[in-house]
């Protein structure tokens, strides 16, 4: 008997078959470099930088940029940004540079070149007859890389948000040490013609490379990061949210996870903390793994760890945090149950407020305060643990312990208390809710409750 088969009848005929489904070719892939080779891309023939500058600038002015030419120019222009490595720099076993080495962004990666010439057309006309200066190259590189950031801004941002960002970026790249090379609003006009450039692998790779370089190397032109900073921890919103969460509640990751009372967290926690990743290594390739092409589908995204993501942002909503109210709910990951757990944890960690004296006039006053606090603690421990409880609350020794919180949820039948619902309604009703956001979910789910 084949354990994989099922047997049934169709029109009195016995059928035996093996049910098979499509294999997901797009599974989560952990970023790791196993062959000790730097991340790499292949571009066309290296250009003459003066000719390339004039061509790309004319394309920027005419809103007609050739992505292959732009990538070829950005890679060639890396030579202008030499800096000194402050410490030995290694990642995934690769020595990137030694302390004191002179390096440029292309020291971090391998850029292979073919013999294929670029177009280097002058689409927008060109008055510049002299050769460009280094500040002009730096300004052009900065503006081009900013197209990456602009293309990552979602359409959910209302009003003139994107235009305002583009204008501020232009101001940066017309102020020393940079120099004005385009007219006002050029960046936004050009962006509309290449709004999806964040999906071009080579462009994304170069943006990540520049960002990884400038995030570590002190440099005159470090402000170029304004356009590339979104490549850091890209598609890691689940892991980044968890990191922010444990900082807020002032617990270790291990302590925080003890409060995650739901079976669906198990797979996600295992996924987030896969051994062998350089999640905690400063300046690792891990930080830019998505842009450097080290993973096709991030195991750290909000979709990959949706229950964790939902819980964290429901706690954030309870606190009235705008970022959480604006975040997008992962609808397939038990948002109703996560909102219940989020209410209890929100109340435990933030709702009561923790006020205590932290600063003193002198050491004597500090010691007197600590002695008085110890006496108070001893008295509390000597108490039998019974408390005059409001709102049917349940206390057991340490009221914030995972056991105590879990017991309170069970005593309330796995439902929110009225005080939780009032809090959720008050924070979400005062907020202009974006489509599919946590604020909208809370409004729709709880605003009709008494």
Curated annotation (Swiss-Prot):
Predominant location category: virion
Entry PTM: Phosphorylated by host CK2. Unphosphorylated protein N seems to have a better affinity for leader viral promoter encapsidation. Phosphorylation of protein N in ribonucleocapsid may stabilize the interaction with protein P, thereby playing an important role in viral transcription/replication.
GO MF terms held by the record: RNA binding
Pfam short name (any one): Rhabdo_ncap
Phosphoserine: residues bearing it: 389
Ribonucleoprotein recorded as keyword: yes
Signal peptide extent: none
GO cellular component: helical viral capsid; host cell cytoplasm; ribonucleoprotein complex; viral nucleocapsid
Subcellular location per the Swiss-Prot or TrEMBL entry: Virion; Host cytoplasm
InterPro entries linked: Rhabdo_ncapsid, Rhabdovirus_ncapsid_C, Rhabdovirus_ncapsid_N, Rhabdovirus_nucleoprotein-like
Presence of the UniProt keyword Kinase in the record: no
Domain of life assignment: Viruses
Role of this protein: Encapsidates the genome in a ratio of one protein N per nine ribonucleotides, protecting it from nucleases. If expressed without protein P it binds non-specifically RNA and therefore can bind it's own mRNA. Interaction with protein P abolishes any non-specific RNA binding, and prevents phosphorylation. The soluble N-P complex encapsidates specifically the genomic RNA, with protein N protecting the genome like a pearl necklace. The encapsidated genomic RNA is termed the nucleocapsid (NC) and serves as template for viral transcription and replication.
Note: Displays a superantigen activity in human and mouse, activating mostly V-beta-8 subtypes of T-cell receptor.
Family membership: Belongs to the lyssavirus nucleocapsid protein family.
Subunit and interaction comment: Homomultimerizes to form the nucleocapsid. Binds to viral genomic RNA. In nucleocapsid, binds protein P and thereby positions the polymerase on the template. Protein P acts as a chaperone on free protein N to prevent it from aggregation before encapsidating genomic RNA.
Protein name: Nucleoprotein
